């Protein structure tokens, strides 16, 4: 859309109204780049996003986003192979933290159905390793000691050396007290010195670093600390070198993910902008309009967002209506009405809410053109007329059936008779070309044109003859009338003079009486409409109250169900604990094999309550294709997601299978056949085993962050069994810090698991108390 219309309608000022609700620099940048579009799918997407965010706010009224700074330049530097500084790493750290918080929020969100917003939440990346690396930089811009063993070693040596310097100086302060001007340790040129009286300067061996202005005090670094100070200076240089090395190393770790982090930052900004739109809706009682497919416009109680105490009006621009001509005297708000229509349409096509009532509809226009100028503040002259006509000629050459045209004081600035004729001719040309137009004029000749011409409608701005002031109410279907006689009479002009004047234009008086009757009918209709709206608002409030009550009842129901599930889980936990003890006794007596213990536990775990999501049940979606199994078939063990091969069938119908290094006995329902063309292994949901090659041998990792307690404990148990089946020696369990409930549950589980040799928190630079490293018995 052309930039001129955006400047004319002051669209930038409108966008500025949303800025106070933004929390991120990415959101601010997207707001500033926002412009109207004629693509219906993009507008519909923006409207759907706002509606979903409104629903989200009903359940989570305090939803917020962590404030972030712009990182486009940082990511660009990474792509150019530059190393980042601490401040830049802190910007990235903030973005990753904001992304993690949004992912956790989405994972725990309930009672809200999201489609458009879900796409954005689910596109956010998870970088646990990078987040761990960036913990090396604290918010004060300091590299933590745990960033590397070398840095920690250097800083320990610096600390020890500085302690020695302090001890030596304190001893000298006591021993040489009479030789000092003050009993303190001073600092000169980064060195620790003693303030020695000039008369004793030769009594204390060392390096002179400064002399006072009076010459009475000499600042000497004692010989005893010179060597230590030099060591400290050397260590400081080593520290700086190591910090540069750390910056380079972490830059290399972050570099491959620069594009993904930049994309996450954009998504965070986009969600922030949607959130700001909804906050604006709440603050200004705005609405998300409906979208018309045929350029029909219906604005209910619409008002201009930049006008304080603006009067709300109704505007209906039907599908067949091509022009609305607002007639009547100036100063009544005609130009504001024109701008309100244009600006509302621009806001909607930019994906913004509008200041109107629910039920409002907007069209889609490829272009909006306007010739708007304040004719009352400039001298009427040929140059003014020429300027307007030049603009109109240019517009007439560009408009088409997909355009909206706004013309202010059409035909003004020249002879009234010629100006009125030109105005009618221009409107007729636009009507024949089926171009939607709203025009204002003070020429009375255009009233007749609006009445006599098909698909053209008159309109006016209401004037209160009692107060002699405009009310700024838009009266569609009613042409403007002159109030000169009424105003003159109220201002004290002789009734004789007013009577003589009215007799000279009796025909016009008849027209004015008709217009007056139309105004009365319009006012009566407006009152009835206002009453209907009041009833609608009451119904809307009642509907919201009922929805709120319904949601509260659902939440209470879910709470009770959760309590019941927790109680059931406790019972099952007790049963599993007892089963562990029984199996332990059996193992000690008959030396059962590990896989037999795991099989027994899997059968016991079937007692645990499971949540059934029918919407994701693939059995209900399509029939399961399956043939009879035979020896040599490749299978997938359903309990663990592990592949194996059938080796023989037992007499009781069960099958023996080789799964990795372990032989297992399975019922047919406990495995699925792998199709010949199937290449990818089946992944068990949320139990992500990642094998890595390192000096410690195979490892695995389980991420329990964002999970509920019951779900986390079930996944942990399955994960440990899988690790044992894979003959792994060590695994990592990421549980986060949070409230500590999951962490405590993990600890209790590991304490009672007889296969666990030892466990403990990860190093600080690998997750600290947010992760546990588990070592199994050999």
UniProtKB/Swiss-Prot annotation:
Pfam families xrefs: MSSS, MutS_V, Smr
GO biological process: mismatch repair; negative regulation of DNA recombination; rescue of stalled ribosome
Residues annotated as binding ATP: 328-335
Enzyme class name: hydrolase
Alphabetized InterPro entries for the sequence: DNA_mismatch_repair_MutS_C, DNA_mismatch_repair_MutS_core, DNA_mismatch_repair_MutS_sf, MSSS, MutS, MutS2, P-loop_NTPase, Smr_dom
GO molecular-function term, one example from the UniProt record: ATP-dependent DNA damage sensor activity
Keywords: ATP-binding, DNA-binding, Endonuclease, Hydrolase, Nuclease, Nucleotide-binding, RNA-binding, rRNA-binding
SMART domains on file: MUTSac, MUTSd, SMR
Limits of the Smr domain: 702-777
This enzyme's EC code(s): 3.1.-.-, 3.6.4.-
Family: Belongs to the DNA mismatch repair MutS family. MutS2 subfamily.
Free-text function comment from the UniProt entry: Endonuclease that is involved in the suppression of homologous recombination and thus may have a key role in the control of bacterial genetic diversity.
Self-association state and partner proteins as the record states: Homodimer. Binds to stalled ribosomes, contacting rRNA.
The protein, known as: Endonuclease MutS2
Species for this entry: Streptococcus pneumoniae (strain ATCC 700669 / Spain 23F-1)
Organismal lineage: Bacteria, Bacillati, Bacillota, Bacilli, Lactobacillales
